[in-house]
Amino acid sequence: MFVKKGDKVRVIAGKDKGVEAVVVTALPKVNKVIVEGVNIVKKHQKSNSENPQGAIVEKEAPIHVSNVQVLDKNGVAGRVGYKFVDGKKVRYNKKSGEVLD
């Protein structure tokens, strides 16, 4: 998967299209990411010792990696490729050519 935790990304599809934020969690087994402040859903919680009445909690839900593009340091969004630099495999922005790692 080309997106990692801590990457700055732009959402390119869905209800939060155009939002730029940071990846909180990457879920490579299901090809999804959780992005800060994106795809907020309301989760109904049962009553427990902390919340005797129960609660409705807003939290971030995962979105598919195909709906985000990684931004480089200059804020250019593009596809991610891999190349070898000094014997190390690094990610780079295919549009700007800038190394991401």
From Swiss-Prot:
What's in the keyword line of the UniProt record?
Answer: Ribonucleoprotein, Ribosomal protein, RNA-binding, rRNA-binding
Matching entries from InterPro entries are given as:
KOW, Rib_uL2_dom2, Ribosomal_uL24, Ribosomal_uL24_CS, Ribosomal_uL24_KOW, Translation_prot_SH3-like_sf
Q: Cellular component terms, GO, for this chain's entry?
A: ribonucleoprotein complex; ribosome
Q: Does the keyword Cell cycle apply?
A: no
> What GO biological process term is on the record, naming one?
translation
Domain of life from the UniProt record: Bacteria
Where along the sequence do coiled-coil regions lie? none
Q: Which GO terms describe its molecular function?
A: rRNA binding; structural constituent of ribosome
- What does the annotation say about its assembly with partners? Part of the 50S ribosomal subunit.
Its function, per the record, reads: One of two assembly initiator proteins, it binds directly to the 5'-end of the 23S rRNA, where it nucleates assembly of the 50S subunit.
User: What family does the database annotate?
Assistant: Belongs to the universal ribosomal protein uL24 family.
* NCBIfam families, A to Z: rplX_bact (TIGR01079)
Name this polypeptide is given: Large ribosomal subunit protein uL24
Gene name for this UniProt entry: rplX
